[in-house]
Amino acid sequence: MEKTTKNGIHRISQEGGKTIAWAEESGVKVLEKDGYYFKDLAKTGELLPYEDWRLSDEERAADLAGRLSIEEIAGLMLYSPHQAVPPMPGGPFQGTFDGKTYLESGKEPYAISDQQKEFLEDEHIRHILLTNVESPEISAKWSNELQKRAETLPYGIPINLSSDPRNGAKDSGAEFKSGGSEISKWPEGVGFAACFDPEVAGQFAKDASREYRALGITTALGPQIDLCTEPRWMRFVDTLGEEVEMSKKLTKAYCDGMQTTEGEADGWGKDSVNTMVKHWPGGGTGEAGRDAHYAFGQFAVYPTGNFEEHLKPFTEAAFHLDGPTDCASAVMPYYTVSYGVDKKNGKNVGNSYSEYLIKDLLRGKYEFKGIVCTDWGITQDPEKMIEGFGSRCYGVQDMTEAERCLLAITNGVDQFGGNSESGPIVEAYKIGCEKYGEKAMRERMELSAKRLLINIFHCGLFEDPYLDPEESAKIVGCEEFCRHGYEAQKKSIVLLKNSAKRAPEGQKGVLPLKKGLKVYIPERKIGPSKAFFRIDLPAKTEDPLPDGLPSKYGTRVASPEEADVALVFIESPACNPYSTEDLANGGNGYLPITLQYRPYTAKKAREVSIAGGDFRENFTNRSYLGKTNTAYNEADLDNILECRRAMGDKPVIVCATVNNPMVMHEFEAEADAIVAEFGVSRAAVLDVVFGGYNPTGRLPIQMPKDMDAVEEQSEDRALDMETYIDSEGHNYDYGYGMNYEGVLPAWKK
């Protein structure tokens, strides 16, 4: 046994037992029994079952759940709003300190805000969503402050910090940094699919779990395992692709890597992070590619009846892991109305409100025992305007908020994402007591409490929730993890074209470029657009390499005339799928989502939409047949064509950030080489372009022949699109890729 004290945290390491740690200021005492030490979290002076680390997590959680009041259980079923550390004035996530802004308060950046104290103490919240942090050390100190505060409160229930994916490399610079980063940088989800190697996703998960735990995070709101069979969906890049077998392999590798602590019999321990797989029953089939964050995109459709395939990443992977933790800890249903799927009740409602999808399938047929947590913001009253970014209580808008909560709870939902007020849940309990009886409702609430507590026990937080900030600073963004991430970035890059037409002597294609060349890189121009929250954004101009071209590669010049080569950075086309102007002019508001740059008129769209019907609309047909839309970033195409004209017989290299499949025929023939990447750093792209890495990535998607092919494919069917064949005869189908020597061998399952 070893006793230590550092920064006001007492810690006892026990041979043959669990290490326990507690804060001096929390008032917690230590109990000794049978030669072991335990924390007296309830401050009763006796060892209660939930305090006894010798018992199973299930036994401990059941004991504690039975001791909690309904108000305390309701608090466990909540999730805090997004928390930034510190919350800066003018940012999206505000906070005050003794009524003052952070900058006015003079507080340390890791101080607990007024709002955080309130939801810990008054609302009994123990699940907190972390966003931006000033540094790993500050995050660790803030986590410790939260855990100290929680330890002083009844039963000493620790905080379960969670995070959306935070290791994306897209905004990284043009030079790789081997260490000292804020966190290791990796490809986006579909980039892992482009590696065609599940071990890459597994390595990410192992490294990220260590970084998460060093930041205080014990739940990952991911992976996003929707089969993205609809190419226009705005969340395509976050998924693990559309091919079900690869998605299953990646899901297992990701969840096992995140949840498993090596050396623990059941897999759970100090390195474990709970995974919350999303989005049940699959959110990748939105009609015409629209997204259900918005009411105009609420419907998921299954034109070929392929619903069952979309369940497989959950039912055949996340729920049956290869590692010792066995199953993903939690599931998040999507906002969507899975249109026409519920044949039993005939109800088209948001997934969390669907008895068929949650109670009958998820809890019943597939026997999922973990947490079901709704997506963020589904219980409040809806926005008056259909394009508003508000509550998504699709199909149950006539209910009260408490009635919506009760419906979700009776279906099998345990937690409400984005809800930080316990009142509606307590009211739901009261309504349920009248409807089902107090005994039945108490048992149902305790069941959710038990599920939620098990995940906190799994991660060892009841014994030791405290971090060493100095150690956290060493772990997060360390050299080893950054190197792993950078290798994964390079491995995910796909070389689509490498023409021999302007290749240097001795090379089969124009890539790799020789170093020391003069390089022209045009600025990108993006027109007026809509932000994620549906806010209007003005037109802008941006430099793809704001820090300049690293001198080891060559010299950046101001014009094509001076250059030896042009390097054109583009992003896949993006557009606005809904127009209030169209609505005001007598239309229905719906526009085609275009995957091409030039104006697109939908001549082959459905005459009548599959799904429709909203209380804010006096029609059900959401068709956009005959309407035209244009990409915000149409000027990306102009850059390519202008460079081709200006460069004459000198090479033009296109580097495309692929957020969605894209129509290539507009520019492919004008490019000597095309490099596709899925959310990686400029440094990784330049490494491939200049010979630092011979590409190995393959397309995890299909590139469409044209927009007619996009309209003709089915939202629910994978790999069913007519694909583009380029000017050199290469088919941009799933699994296609090149290296410097030529086309990679054909992909086989």
Please report, for each region that a protein language model flagged, where it lies by residue.
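Glycoside hydrolase catalytic-domain context in secreted enzymes
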Residues: 1-749
